From Swiss-Prot:
Gene Ontology biological process terms in this record: translation
Gene designation per UniProt: rpmI
Cited SUPFAM superfamilies: L35p-like
Keywords: Ribonucleoprotein, Ribosomal protein
Name this protein carries in UniProt: Large ribosomal subunit protein bL35
One of the record's GO molecular function terms: structural constituent of ribosome
Source organism per UniProt: Leifsonia xyli subsp. xyli (strain CTCB07)
GO CC, any one term: cytosolic large ribosomal subunit
Length: 64
């Protein structure tokens, strides 16, 4: 049976930490930033841990 290909969109959006958690960039930092407060922008700029329910599918797309 052939190998499963890595999902090209997923490999650009997610990364797996050394402990196995799946990280993603929080949405909302692309445009209309002048109407968002600095506290909100700081919170949105941080990476976010993907919930374990979704991380299972992300790992499968990444071939892990």
């Amino acid at each position: 049976m052939p190998k499963q290909k890595t999902h090209s969109g997923a490999k650009k959006r997610f990364k797996i930490t050394g402990s196995g958690k799946v990280m993603k960039q929080q949405a909302g930092m692309r445009h209309n930033l002048e109407v968002k407060g600095s506290d909100r922008k700081r919170r949105l700029n941080a990476d976010q841990v993907v919930p374990e329910v979704d991380a299972k599918f992300v790992r499968r797309m990444l071939g892990k």
